[in-house]
């Protein structure tokens, strides 16, 4: 190449650099002024870089608006790395490069662009050059914004028809360098540069979300049935599939048209819960007279002759000796209209955790109150279990309550209407305060659990002429049916486990149904298991079990030691969520101190027990209106309602209260006292 050509090229290059420096404030492209003119004869690179657009086969991969190109340039056709402070660190590759740029062939080792291509800095005006670059500039990429834990939606964007995502993303990256022309005005360059930077920093933003440094920035999703169209469609398809398999006729054929109801007997210690349960089993024929006579003789020999009916429920030797129920007893009886499972909860304060586990499996609560003088006051006063059991039952979803005023035949009471009204009045006020509708959800009746008066047969009018209402069994048989979700996704919180010729788990089916041989998923371990055998309330093997049933399942695919109460058997297509962080509405019912960020306690949710701590208080709810405060409260005390972020030590299986009430409500306890109740409103991603 002649000296004159070299001089012309050098002049053009310096002129182009000067134009870029004037337009961009002499900051971004100052490195080009340091270009070594002595290296020109080896490759003719001046023309190739004047467009600042890069090649498809060797262009710039990423542009930094602060100071030049950061990443490596393809060594087949130019500089290997550009120094952000100004200038290239290494000389160009003398091998040059050949390729094709926008259908124009080039050979940058021997010649400029072929096929009549004219460098962009020669033969055109500044205005023409700007127009060309505007047309070539790519449109801003659409960004994805997570708006639901169950799916991803495009926010403020529409998808182009017929565009392949992989090719589109590749072209967007290749064109990212083309939009950085040095001759544009600063106001026109900065805005598109910022938009182009967003996709580059996506990885950094994702890391910030996973660390969740700020609770107020939590990406949380409130699960609703309409949150994600795809999930709704799949759920509808599953429900439709299961509806074809199970209908009302199948249920009627299996159980003779009788639905199943789980009852929990609760109340203060020595209120007569186990005795009443044992008498119900005897009166309905579930326990024969010979067995009762046997228990009566054994109780008399042990000096406990008045406890023989309770021995039907209390099978443990320690329970019989002390006259106190320790664990939740289970029994089954049947009437002409319904099938029942009795859950006999322990009344002692030491065993409240067992009572909570029993209440989580119940449909209807039977609150047993002793009318005997002194016993009623002890049970209902602060510290007694009557109030706490009623509160826990409401928290666990027991919305129907039968309050039986027991021991009405005691000599201190003698079926007194005045004593009965006193008990009813005090309990009514408390039940109303914790959320029960006294007119529709609660019924009161006087009974004698020991003599059986008003359990199955009406009390003698001579003894109690003032009560004309139904007996306990009459009311249970005629009350409204409990809503069942037979064709919903299968879910069974595990209440107990054992090893008997394999792994056996026990619990109440909260939704859906299960068949022998069906595959399920054990959460939170995400272990696939197979149902080998199904046993109903009477220990008989069946082929199918429905929502509301108390069952035992022999499962294959997991060992007994790998299961804990609180695990959930769930549908593989719609598994329950397993989380450690969620947002909940909490009502503080009993607390001597205060709750603030960092406060730890024990959470009971369905059959699970897990340690939990308060991450942050978000809002305080006004009394009456539940209006959220704008500023987060510094602490919470007794009587307050707050919205807070909670975090568990280990993953726990939960759902939002709106989707699955039974799996979205919980109780907080500390130092043997129930301090708060709550419901899950959002689940953190």
UniProtKB/Swiss-Prot annotation:
Catalyses: GTP + H2O = GDP + phosphate + H(+)
- Top-rank EC class of the record's enzyme: hydrolase
Q: Per the record, which residues fall in region G2?
A: 323-327
The UniProt keyword set, sorted, is: Acetylation, Amyloid, Cytoplasm, GTP-binding, Hydrolase, Nucleotide-binding, Phosphoprotein, Prion, Protein biosynthesis, Repeat
Q: Where is this region: G3?
A: 344-347
Residues annotated as region Charged? 139-249
- Primary location group: cytoplasm
Question: Where does this protein have compositionally biased stretches of type Basic and acidic residues?
Answer: 166-222
Which positions bear Phosphoserine?
571
Q: Where in the cell is it found?
A: Cytoplasm
What GO molecular function terms would the record report?
A: GTP binding; GTPase activity; identical protein binding; mRNA binding; ribosome binding; translation release factor activity
Q: Where does GTP bind?
A: 267-274, 406-409, 449-450
Further facts:
[PSI+] is the prion form of SUP35. [PSI+] is the result of a conformational change of the cellular SUP35 protein that becomes self-propagating and infectious. This conformational change generates a form of SUP35 that assembles into amyloid fibrils. [PSI+]-aggregates sequester soluble SUP35, resulting in defects in faithful translation termination by read-through of translation termination codons. [PSI+] can be cured by GdnHCl and by deletion of the molecular chaperone HSP104, which is required for [PSI+] propagation.
Q: What is known of its domains?
A: The prion domain (PrD) is a Gln/Asn (Q/N)-rich domain, which is unstructured in its native, soluble form, and which forms a parallel in-register beta-sheet in its amyloid form.
Name by which UniProt lists this protein:
Eukaryotic peptide chain release factor GTP-binding subunit
Q: Which organism is it from?
A: Saccharomyces cerevisiae (strain ATCC 204508 / S288c)
The organism's taxonomy opens as: Eukaryota, Fungi, Dikarya, Ascomycota, Saccharomycotina
